[in-house]
Design a protein with these regions (language model features):
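Amphipathic alpha-helical extensions and coiled-coil-like segments
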Residues: 12, 150-225
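Short, charged/polar connector segments at secondary-structure boundaries
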Residues: 1-83, 89-103
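Amphipathic, charge-rich alpha-helical segments that serve as recognition/docking helices
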Residues: 24-25, 32-33, 67-163, 170-173, ...
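A structural signal for alpha-helix termini and helix-coil/disorder junctions
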Residues: 41, 101, 119-123, 202, ...
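Intrinsically disordered, low-complexity regions enriched in polar/acidic and amide residues
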Residues: 1-3, 130, 153, 210
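Residues at the start of alpha-helices and the adjacent loop-to-helix junctions
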Residues: 61-62, 137, 174, 211
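Glutamine-centric residue-chemistry signal
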Residues: 22, 44-46, 100, 131, ...
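Low-complexity, flexible helical/coil segments
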Residues: 46-52, 83, 97, 114-121, ...
Length: 225
């Protein structure tokens, strides 16, 4: 389907599938309740964006929360726009549409940036000879920063924290550990991160930036934490 030929159609919920490795959480929170109430009152104003799969189902590019809300209030079908997208195009589109949300946790943004970064790199690697791309001189990180409103350095930091163990990431998301110290701790091996987590739980505190930098250096020097 070409973009100019797009139209809204209704698809059964049972034929919709979540995006593979979707980095954005769908939570049954107060915002979800508000969304459900809005759908009850006005219907789904913005159609979901989906792409066709070979088995006759559709993968959601944008609209995971709307699908969840529609299921909860008993909808059988939802309005969608069907787009034929290659895998990497779908990743970029999914990330871009979800980054527009007001409330995004650090871990959601981190994994979204990582997925987009890897997709852009793959697309660039497959570029055919003779094709003109005005962004060829820019790094993938810089492109993401320009499009998403973060500096290239900040994009790199977000991607780096995807190397944290889940329990560490939870502390970043809930605000109990600062983002910048977390970036430094992401350089630790997984075993060291678990030991660090145990120490944090025992002391009931999280490291400052200066402490995290010292811990990172100890790890790099091969010394026991």
């Amino acid at each position: 389907l070409q973009k100019q030929d797009e139209r809204v159609v209704e698809i059964e919920l049972e034929r919709l599938r979540g995006f593979v490795n979707h980095p954005f959480k769908v939570l049954a929170d107060s915002q979800m309740i508000e969304l459900q109430e809005s759908i009850k009152k006005y219907g789904i104003l913005n159609p979901l964006i989906v792409r066709p799969r070979q088995d006759g189902t559709y993968e959601i590019i944008s609209g995971h929360r709307r699908k969840f809300a529609a299921e909860k209030i008993g909808y059988r079908k939802v309005p969608v726009i069907i787009r034929v997208l290659k895998d990497d195009e779908a990743v970029v589109s999914m990330v871009d549409s979800n980054l527009q949300r007001e409330m995004i946790s650090p871990s959601e943004k981190a994994f979204a940036y990582k997925m987009k970064y890897e997709a852009i790199k793959r697309k660039a690697g497959r570029r055919k000879c003779g094709q003109v791309d005005h962004n060829l001189g820019k790094k993938s990180i810089e492109l993401i920063g320009e499009e998403c409103g973060d500096s290239p350095k900040q994009v790199q930091r977000y991607i780096k924290i995807t190397e944290l163990i889940p329990e560490m990431l939870e502390k970043v998301d809930d605000g109990s550990m600062g983002f910048t110290p977390a970036v430094q701790l992401s350089f630790l091996k997984k075993k060291e991160q678990k030991e660090m987590l145990d120490a944090m739980e025992f002391a009931q505190c999280t490291p400052s930036l200066s402490q995290a930098l010292r811990i990172k250096k100890l790890s790099a020097d091969g010394k026991v934490l």
